[in-house]
Amino acid sequence: MSRAGNRGNTQARWLGTGLLGLFLLPMYLSLEVSVGKATTIYAINGSSILLPCTFSSCYGFENLYFKWSYNNSETSRILIDGIVKNDKSDPKVRVKDDDRITLEGSTKEKTNNISILLSDLEFSDTGRYTCFVRNPKEKDLNNSATIFLQVVDKLEKVDNTVTLIILAVVGGVIGLLVCILLLKKLITFILKKTREKKKECLVSSSGNDNTENGLPGSKAEEKPPTKV
């Protein structure tokens, strides 16, 4: 009985965990924040850089709060924050820490874009930039995404020689395989036709031999019609 009871308790715990996961999963999937595919971006000192950020919500949003924050090993601060009333209005900035920052995004037409433009870059701007979003309509559910900005003196040219060599080799191998397959099919087709011709020749030769030897079914066996 003890084993059966333990088995029942284990199944109940697993069932409870599964139900809890199914309950929490929509919450984690409903509000998403993205800063693009690249986790690190590079920009030249003195130039401008667009820090991308978009959000999405399955349940819509009202009075959505957003902010951009900056931090490195020495300091941390909020760069800009604001409110988006709904999907028909643009973001309204409340606080802006630096005049070099401009909100470039728009939330109209379901773009949900709260990207910022950082101008006149300095080497001290190197660090992590986090885009944070909180949606009161989803019981203040929040999410964030971080991108690392590296300010450099000049951008290094990427040497694609190795990549081009690899692509050329792979392309050559694929081309060779295709040629081999086509040649194999051609040889198979020629051999098949050759066998068919040989077979026809043998059948024809066999029929001629039967005719010459007067075998049954040959023309030599035929008799002229009897005259009455």
Swiss-Prot record:
Residues 31-161 are extracellular. It is a single-pass type I membrane protein. InterPro entries: Ig-like_dom, Ig-like_dom_sf, Ig-like_fold, Ig_sub, Ig_V-set, Myelin_P0-rel. Residues 219-228 have a biased composition (Basic and acidic residues). Glycans are attached at N45, N71, N113, N142. Its main location: membrane. Gene3D superfamilies: Immunoglobulins (2.60.40.10). The keyword Chloroplast does not apply. Residues 199-228 are annotated as: Disordered. GO terms for molecular function: sodium channel regulator activity; transmembrane transporter binding; voltage-gated sodium channel activity; voltage-gated sodium channel activity involved in cardiac muscle cell action potential. Disulfide bonds join C53-C131. Residues 183-228 are cytoplasmic. Belongs to the sodium channel auxiliary subunit SCN4B (TC 8.A.17) family. A voltage-gated sodium (Nav) channel consists of an ion-conducting pore-forming alpha subunit functional on its own that is regulated by one or more beta subunits. The beta subunit SCN4B is disulfide-linked to the pore-forming alpha subunit. Interacts with SCN1A; regulatory subunit of SCN1A/Nav1.1. Interacts with SCN2A; regulatory subunit of SCN2A/Nav1.2. This is Sodium channel regulatory subunit beta-4. The lineage of its organism: Eukaryota, Metazoa, Chordata, Craniata, Vertebrata.
